[in-house]
């Protein structure tokens, strides 16, 4: 098993964790953000100091790589790459929507065997970033930007119970009313939930090229024009 620094900044929450041998031993979270530019550097410094003071040499840095907030992802990935360069560590990039699935799989044993998971990240209006996975986190449908209406995900709902969660799911409750649709509240991507996926990546030696790795934005960033003053 390994000692890993985890960084998650894809949504308004900012979180950092250290895991050792598959258990979280340190975590810092600000759930009331976005405060990534202010908080992330402090959290990472505290995490590194904790690991150093407890004689826990890091084996890798894992970062949640999107989709999500353009600014949050850019800050998180830049920080992760900086630590990798500074300490000569390998980089792990984890899909944010898979990270969201971890607490559902860990803490919701009531899920039936044929259940499908649909993590959602709020985009804008009725749009979400979403994917569909089975319980083994194998993709049933790849990540996409969906405009949700009454017929969304019907091809899956007609055959399986589908569990929707994440900060994009709340606004979909009134639209997705199929009897096989289930909603789980209170789920968000957090650094403390990254360790199972990061451990798997280390076991498979699934590392990213630190020099060229970029976040998965899914959509290009479009800056809004400032309003003209009258």
What are the language-model segments listed below?
Residues 62-96:
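DPxDG-like acidic metal-binding loop motif
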Residues 47-51, 86, 104, 194-202:
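Stable alpha-helical structural segments in soluble proteins, enriched in small hydrophobic residues
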Residues 184-230:
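Acyltransferase
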Residues 51-58, 85-94, 110-112:
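Phosphate-handling active-site elements
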Residues 31-39, 70, 74, 78, ...:
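Residues at secondary-structure transition points
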Residues 23-25, 35, 90-189, 217, ...:
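Surface "functional belts" at beta-alpha junctions
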Residues 1-67:
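N-terminal beta-alpha supersecondary unit
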């Amino acid at each position: 098993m390994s000692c890993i620094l985890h960084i998650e900044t894809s949504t308004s929450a900012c979180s950092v964790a250290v895991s050792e041998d598959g258990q979280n031993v340190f975590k810092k979270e600000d759930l009331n953000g976005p405060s990534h530019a202010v908080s992330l550097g402090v959290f990472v410094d505290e995490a590194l100091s904790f690991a150093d003071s407890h004689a826990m040499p890091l084996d890798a840095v894992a970062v949640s790589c999107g989709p999500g907030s353009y600014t949050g992802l850019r800050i998180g990935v830049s920080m992760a790459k900086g630590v990798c360069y500074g300490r000569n560590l390998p980089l792990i990039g984890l899909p944010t929507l898979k990270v969201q699935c971890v607490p559902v799989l860990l803490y919701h044993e009531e899920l039936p065997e044929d259940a499908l998971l649909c993590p959602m990240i709020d985009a804008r209006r009725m749009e979400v970033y979403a994917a569909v996975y089975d319980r083994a986190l194998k993709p049933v449908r790849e990540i996409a930007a969906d405009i949700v209406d009454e017929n969304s995900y019907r091809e899956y709902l007609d055959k399986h119970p589908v569990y929707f969660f994440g900060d994009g799911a709340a606004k979909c409750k009134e639209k997705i009313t199929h009897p096989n649709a289930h909603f789980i509240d209170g789920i968000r991507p957090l650094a403390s939930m990254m360790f199972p996926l990061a451990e798997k990546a280390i076991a498979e030696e699934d590392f990213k090229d630190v020099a060229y790795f970029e976040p998965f934005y899914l959509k290009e960033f479009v800056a809004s024009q400032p309003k003209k003053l009258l």
